[in-house]
């Protein structure tokens, strides 16, 4: 069976603002199955942003677990992320899940991987997915050379990724926190 491929998720933190955005394309083999998927969401009463890349079903499973961890730790993003990563790495069924998450609250941005990694990105920029390297490079250049707010940086970075990565489109969902 073919795998679902691709997406681009990027987060930019500047000053007291953070933006997290993603494209809407879901690809199966060489066919675009959907162009309007919503891979960026607000959770925990709108206080936490989360974006996911990888297998859609796996990502939703992880998203549900992450929300439960946030409730358990009363919104403490770091503790919830570390606990999820620990479960993800040690649980035999979870270990097979193929997805990555970027999470952000008003203070912290984290990348959570299936290897058990919880990464605090340097420079306030994080990106995952098939177009992640393009988006991260573009965001880094924009942050270092402009005064654009995070939402605009995310939009421009996603646009560049969409022009270069065949698994990324230009139908964006961007969420922000101040």
Swiss-Prot record:
> Where does the UniProt annotation place the signal sequence?
none
Q: How is its activity regulated?
A: Allosterically activated by HslU binding.
- What name is this protein filed under? ATP-dependent protease subunit HslV
Residues the record marks as active site: 7
Q: Which InterPro entries match?
A: ATP-dep_Prtase_HsIV_su (IPR022281), Ntn_hydrolases_N (IPR029055), Proteasome_sua/b (IPR001353), Proteasome_suB-type (IPR023333)
Q: What is its main location?
A: cytoplasm
Q: How does it assemble?
A: A double ring-shaped homohexamer of HslV is capped on each side by a ring-shaped HslU homohexamer. The assembly of the HslU/HslV complex is dependent on binding of ATP.
Q: What class of enzyme is it?
A: hydrolase
Task: Tell me the function of this protein.
Answer: Protease subunit of a proteasome-like degradation complex believed to be a general protein degrading machinery.
Task: Say if the entry is tagged with keyword Cell inner membrane.
Answer: no
Q: Which organism is it from?
A: Cupriavidus metallidurans (strain ATCC 43123 / DSM 2839 / NBRC 102507 / CH34)
Q: Give the location in the cell.
A: Cytoplasm
Q: Tell me the name of the encoding gene.
A: hslV
């Amino acid at each position: 069976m073919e795998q679902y491929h691709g997406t681009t998720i990027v987060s930019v933190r500047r000053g007291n603002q953070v933006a997290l955005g993603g494209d809407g394309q879901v690809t199966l083999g060489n066919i675009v199955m959907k162009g309007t998927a919503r891979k960026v969401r607000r959770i925990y009463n709108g206080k936490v942003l989360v974006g996911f890349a990888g297998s859609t079903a796996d990502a939703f499973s992880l998203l549900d677990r992450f929300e439960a961890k946030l409730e358990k730790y009363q919104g403490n993003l770091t503790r919830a992320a570390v606990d999820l990563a620990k479960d993800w790495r040690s649980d035999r069924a979870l270990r097979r899940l193929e997805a990555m998450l970027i999470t952000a609250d008003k203070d912290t941005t984290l990348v959570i991987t299936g290897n058990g990694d919880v990464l605090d990105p340097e420079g306030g920029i994080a990106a995952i997915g098939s177009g992640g390297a393009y988006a991260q490079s573009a965001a880094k250049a924009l942050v270092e050379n402009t005064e654009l707010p995070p939402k605009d940086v995310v939009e421009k970075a996603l646009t560049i990724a969409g022009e270069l990565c065949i698994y990324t489109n230009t139908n964006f969902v961007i969420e922000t926190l101040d």
